[in-house]
């Protein structure tokens, strides 16, 4: 491992803000495998993953990124052993409940994407409380993808557009539909 001789402040000054992405997405993958390699249970790795999210969020805010998406739980994750699913859901509830004050203090607006209706009731409730509590923050937006897949996203987009066409919110002309997708 090579270390950098420059202090963080000097590195931050070297960042070209005009070339900085506005949105960064991170797929949370490998935490369980890492834990097993270290001789721990998979859930230990997931709990350490929370620290990685904190660090990524702090760094993203510090350099001026406006949106950070964390792909935390995909629809495929329901195929894991039940004890691991339960542990992940408990970790989600615990983390959200314990981080909401810190999110507020740091100007972080929390939102979510995915089929959150498919999550356990306690997860939905804690998530919604945190979303509501941070809704007026705008330094950076943390988007948590939960019960998410690309297929779900496509189905959801088609359903939303179809409903808007039916209610005449958007015109069913080709150009109007294309603009709705962008």
Where are these regions (language model features)?
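N-terminal secretory leader/proregion of peptide precursors and effectors
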Residues: 1-3
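Flexible, compositionally biased loop and terminal segments
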Residues: 5-182
């Amino acid at each position: 491992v090579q270390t950098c001789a420059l202090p963080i402040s000097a590195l931050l000054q070297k960042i070209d803000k005009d070339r900085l992405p506005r949105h960064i997405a991170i797929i949370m993958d490998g935490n369980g495998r890492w834990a097993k390699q270290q001789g721990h249970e998979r859930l230990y790795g997931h709990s350490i993953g929370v620290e990685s999210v904190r660090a990524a969020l702090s760094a993203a805010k510090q350099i001026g990124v406006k949106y950070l998406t964390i792909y935390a739980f995909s629809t495929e994750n329901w195929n894991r052993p039940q004890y691991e699913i339960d542990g992940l859901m408990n970790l989600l509830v615990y983390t959200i409940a314990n981080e909401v004050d810190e999110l507020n203090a740091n100007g972080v607006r929390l939102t979510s994407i995915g089929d959150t209706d498919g999550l356990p009731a306690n997860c939905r409730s804690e998530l919604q409380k945190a979303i509501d509590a941070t809704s007026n923050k705008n330094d950076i937006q943390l988007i948590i993808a939960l019960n998410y897949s690309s297929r779900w996203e496509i189905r959801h987009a088609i359903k939303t557009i179809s409903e808007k066409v039916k209610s005449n919110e958007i015109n069913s002309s080709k150009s109007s539909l294309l603009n709705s997708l962008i």
